[in-house]
Amino acid sequence: MNYISFPTAQHAVDKIAQEFVIYSQLNHPVHISLSGGSTPKLLFKTLAKSPYAEQINWKNLHFWWGDDRMVPPSDPESNYGEVQKLLFDHIQIPAENIHRIRGENEPHFELKRFEEELSAVIPNGVFDWIILGMGIDGHTASLFPHQTNFDDENLAVIAKHPESGQIRISKTAKLIEQAKRITYLVTGESKADILKEIQTTPAENLPYPAAKIKAKNGVTEWYLDKAAVRLL
């Protein structure tokens, strides 16, 4: 496991925010896929403030999501809604740079629409940077243990949360693995046990999508805080 340990979650988030500045200064569109969860909320709040809000050339950055729940943006469960509230409402970014999963739509209709948008905007399917989280069950995006098809050739998939039954749309494992760079942002003591397991056990012997999904031709890295690395 290629990991970097930071003293706190805020330190990890600041490093990511600094890299947003660098990506935004490239002279071409940069496609970044965001994650839901508590640590990304800290990232969005950080990006919305000085100095990052002013230093980032937002018009060069295109934002996507690894997954989202099939709820409207006004619902607190919406990953897109969180980013809108914490970041997009506070910056100047072109509307066409935001490529959300439309959770208010019927799932099968939205799956087709979202795949068509992906194909049109990123024809080669290669994201510049995909930021992912990991649940304590080892899921990432909405790809859950024992129900993920790692050979699915589609770009996105309808997924069901194994406990709540909540419907989501997620990028497929194969699409994620085409990225130039994948960063797992994982913080907190609750993740320490599973991180130890991932570090010490071959991925093929584990059921966790987060252990298996890696960039095929790019960089895969883990940004962890002190609490998460305590057993490594």
From Swiss-Prot:
It is an enzyme of class 3 (hydrolase). Pathway: Carbohydrate degradation; pentose phosphate pathway; D-ribulose 5-phosphate from D-glucose 6-phosphate (oxidative stage): step 2/3. One of its GO terms (biological process) is pentose-phosphate shunt. InterPro entries: 6-phosphogluconolactonase_DevB, Glc/Gal-6P_isomerase, NagB/RpiA_transferase-like, PGLS. It catalyses: 6-phospho-D-glucono-1,5-lactone + H2O = 6-phospho-D-gluconate + H(+). Its EC number is 3.1.1.31. One of its GO terms (molecular function) is 6-phosphogluconolactonase activity. Keywords: Hydrolase. PANTHER family: 6-PHOSPHOGLUCONOLACTONASE. Belongs to the glucosamine/galactosamine-6-phosphate isomerase family. 6-phosphogluconolactonase subfamily. Hydrolysis of 6-phosphogluconolactone to 6-phosphogluconate. This is 6-phosphogluconolactonase. It comes from Haemophilus influenzae (strain ATCC 51907 / DSM 11121 / KW20 / Rd).
